[in-house]
Each structure stands twice: as structure tokens, then as C-alpha cells.
Amino acid sequence: NSPALAASETGSALLAAEDVALRSGHPASVVRLAGIYGPGRNRLIEQARAGMNVPAEPAQYTNRIHRDDAAGLLAHLLAQAEQRELLAPCYLGVDDEPAPLHEVVGWLQQQLGVSAQADGPGSTRMGSKRCSNALARESGWVPQYPSYREGYAALLD
């Protein structure tokens, strides 16, 4: 439960919007969705296919959520609110498994039958976070795709 820190203007704007919602005097909860992937959102698959090369050290932990799980979490929380259930101020919309980017890309490349290329595109990702969906799960939400493996496998079939 570390506090959210904004590393960009966009992040600052999002935190300010969350603050406005939570201090509005109206019932509100914030849902922070991690990297959304799914049908039509295949950027990492395309980067892996192009030979993306991600060093193992230092590990860049990433969090993601399948599009269907993101929608399912929102629907679940809205249904709870409709039943007058008390919601937490903030939920993290992530799958069960924060993973190092090199592991995710390596797994995708293995599934695609391609290899990382020495001159392939590199990661421009900054930061490294391990987020937990424990609070969302405690509310009764269960992701259909608990890790990147199940989610991306469904896209690659």
C-alpha cells in the first residue's frame, strides 16, 4: 500500500482527478488500471514479434490486465455499489502476477517462435512496480486471465 507518486504531468493530472472524485462529498472509488491488453491492443505482441530485446537486469517489473478483466472488474464494482456495498477508496486493476518485462517478452517470443534480436527494439519503459489486486479479489472479483500467460495465450490462439 505505497502512496501513488506521479512521475509525469499526466500522472499528476490523474492523481488530481482522483482527489477531486474522492473529496467530492459523493460516494466514489478510484480504479487504477494497469497496462490494458486484449483484442486490438497488441502492442507488446508486435514488439516481441519484431525481436524486442529487454535486458534481464535490472528487472523492470510490469503489471497488466486483460481488457475483459478490466471491464469485468468495473462491472463487479458497479454491481456492488448498486447493492449499497461499501467500496474501498481505491482498487488496482491488475492481474495476479506482476512480472519482469523480459520474462513476459521472452514468453511471448517463445510462443511466437521468434527470438530477441541484438539490434531489435529496446524497452523505453521507465519505472518498476509490483502492484497487487488483493483488495479487488477481497471484494469477490476473480480475473478470467490471472496472469499474462493465460491472457496472451487467448490472443495468440
Predicted segments, located by residue:
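Conserved catalytic-site region of short-chain dehydrogenase/reductase
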Residues: 1-6, 36-40
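Active-site Tyr-X1-5-Lys
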Residues: 5-29
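Substrate-positioning beta->alpha
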Residues: 13, 30-36, 43-46, 56-78
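Short, surface-exposed alpha-helical segments at coil->helix boundaries
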Residues: 14-18, 42, 98, 102, ...
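Short aromatic/basic micro-patch
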Residues: 30, 64, 98, 130-131
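A short C-terminal helix-loop "cap" of Rossmann-like NAD(P)-dependent dehydrogenase/epimerase domains
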Residues: 47-57, 114-118
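Mid/C-terminal beta-alpha module of Rossmann-like enzyme folds, strongest
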Residues: 71-73, 80-127
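C-terminal amphipathic/interface module of NAD(P)-dependent oxidoreductases
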Residues: 124-157
